[in-house]
Amino acid sequence: MRRPFSLLAGALLAGALTVSAVPAASAADGDDGFTIKDPRIKESSGLAASRQHPGVYWTHNDSGYGPQIYAVDGRTGETVATVTLSGIGTPRDVEAISIGPDDQIYVGDIGDNRGGTWPYVWIYRLPEPKELKDQTIRATQYVVKYENGARDAESMVVHPKTGRVYIIDKNEDGGHLYEGPAELSASGTNIFRPIAPVDLWATDAALSPDGEHLAVRGYFGGIHYDWNGGRIKRAGRLQVPLQAQGESLTYSADGSKLLYGSEGADSPVVAYDAPGAGKKGTAPSSRDGSGAAGSGAGGSGGLGAGTLAAAVVAVVAVLGLGRLLRRRR
């Protein structure tokens, strides 16, 4: 995945504010945040809550790694199963994971490090194992193309009721929600067509367990939508934690939480109440116009005014240095 210089500023900011920005985990159900402890998981780029195994979350590495997904215990942060996918080619740039009907896991090999020039990408589907142990499971591979040409993407969701797959492309100026065919075909090419704009540089997305709400995150903000049969309607902004490389998002299995993950070793997964959860003492979202995403107002991950001001100065300084270096080239 490409990492623009401006993201470096965000990484420095997130690193400086990790203690302030990450709310403490307290519950024992694994849905209140954790730290991924497995040293093999250095670029967690997708997250999905297990439906068969309460408190367990599936994740995977980004590009340059093998065909493995990992089951992580949300109570301890420890890996409890490593699943190797067989029956597929060499993964290229895996960016997303989602669970559909009948406990089917979908893995999105949909990233494009060449900036949207690969003529096709892939989706892999496999059954979620009933037993959590290291094992190899045969997966089905689907070829995906976009109706309006190749593009980079990091967000894929599967509707929990219909099983239809959707992708959001990654564009700094905003992307689109792409709808796949009613059923994916393993024997032909699956064409995804744009059906709605998404006003965000999207790095991941998640559908609520009831299929009624779509949450989309970027590096520094997020939006939640009413699903509306895929003709999404913007409902408000999401509070997104400041993270070094925030590229994963999932609802908890009961839909009460949104969990935000990041790339990096020992990366934290931060939990906020999902829109409408109504938990006291948090501010997971705001209606449009009522506040900025990530403001932290009223939440355990909130930032003090002095800390935020210092952080802004640091970001401006880093961006200024970047411009100076570019002029000297």
Placement of each model-derived feature along the sequence:
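Sequence/structural signature of beta-propeller domains
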Residues: 2-10, 14-18, 23-329
